[in-house]
A protein has these predicted regions:
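Generic alpha-helical transmembrane segments of integral inner-membrane proteins
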Residues: 30-41, 69-70, 90, 94, ...
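Helix-loop-helix "hairpin" substructures at the membrane interface of multi-pass membrane proteins
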Residues: 105, 109-113, 119-124, 128, ...
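Transmembrane alpha-helical segments of polytopic membrane transport and secretion proteins
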Residues: 1-30
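Interfacial loop-to-helix junctions that mark the boundaries of transmembrane helices
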Residues: 17-25, 49-59, 103-108, 180-195
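Single transmembrane alpha-helix segments in multi-pass membrane proteins
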Residues: 33-43, 50-102, 106, 126-133
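Hydrophobic alpha-helical transmembrane segments
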Residues: 25-30, 57, 65, 86-90, ...
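Small-residue-rich segments of transmembrane alpha-helices in multi-pass membrane proteins
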Residues: 63, 92-93, 141-150, 229
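Transmembrane helix-bundle core of multi-pass membrane transporters
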Residues: 136-211, 239-240
Length: 241
């Protein structure tokens, strides 16, 4: 009796290129390459693709990219946070106020700022879960509250919309070395924020593809009812995100 496997001629074997193009990350990579080629070809200075030019635009892109990592995780889970951008400014403003007005060590101020940001995120998640309103609406309200508070508090406490004197705070030099220093590639200086961006991208990729929590994130974005039926802690995952 033959044990040779049977084949179904109706099933067409997909090529490597077809399989690759079906992956969403490949589409994103091709889009990034296309944009890079477009800007390089239209750059009249000729510096865009050279080290000085790359250092310039990655200095701008890195902080945005770091925020985008967190936003991307939330979007994969089927939610959206409109307040993430202003939350960055609010946290930085809070840290600046603590060190300039209260003379606090900058590391303690950073910890307080992160705890404050986590609390706002918790409130957003709690409101979304309990009001059943779209996260877009909840975080839009948070956006306006934080933006108004930023202007009001800085004007009341400093008389302007800027906070100065942070460089005099205790712990400033060590914090600057970790978060605001530079490193060299060839003869060109790059901001350390670029290294943080790459590191956090790798960490987020590992989280999504190699951990149970990453599976929960994908499950929420796919079908929340099926995810709940499969045992995914929906409320817990949304609050954490």
């Amino acid at each position: 009796m033959s044990t040779a496997p049977t084949t179904d001629e109706r099933v067409k074997k997909a090529s490597f290129l077809t399989k690759a193009l079906r992956r969403t990350e490949v589409g994103a990579l091709l889009g990034a390459i296309a944009i890079f080629v477009l800007f390089t070809s239209t750059d009249t200075t000729g510096n865009f693709a050279k080290l000085p030019g790359i250092a310039g635009w990655t200095d701008i892109a890195a902080p945005i990219g770091i925020v985008a990592i967190a936003v991307a995780l939330l979007m994969i889970a089927g939610e959206f946070d409109l307040s993430s951008g202003v939350m960055v400014g609010t946290t930085g403003l809070l840290v600046g106020m603590l060190v300039s007005k209260l003379g606090m060590n900058i590391w303690l101020a950073i910890v307080i700022g992160l705890v404050f940001a986590a609390f706002i995120g918790f409130v957003n998640g709690y409101m979304v879960l309990n009001t059943k309103l779209p996260s877009f609406i909840i975080t839009l309200g948070t956006f306006f509250i934080l933006k108004g508070a930023n202007f009001a508090l800085t004007m009341i406490l400093t008389g302007s919309v800027r906070v100065t004197g942070v460089e005099k705070a205790a712990g400033y030099d060590s914090a600057k070395a970790i978060f605001a220093s530079t490193f060299k590639i060839g003869e060109q200086n790059f901001q350390i924020s670029l290294a943080w961006w790459l590191l956090l991208t790798v960490a987020a990729t590992f989280l999504l593809t190699r951990t149970k929590f990453g599976n929960w994130i994908f499950a929420l974005g796919g079908d929340i009812i099926s995810a709940r039926a499969a045992g995914v802690p929906v409320e817990k995952t949304k609050i954490v995100l």
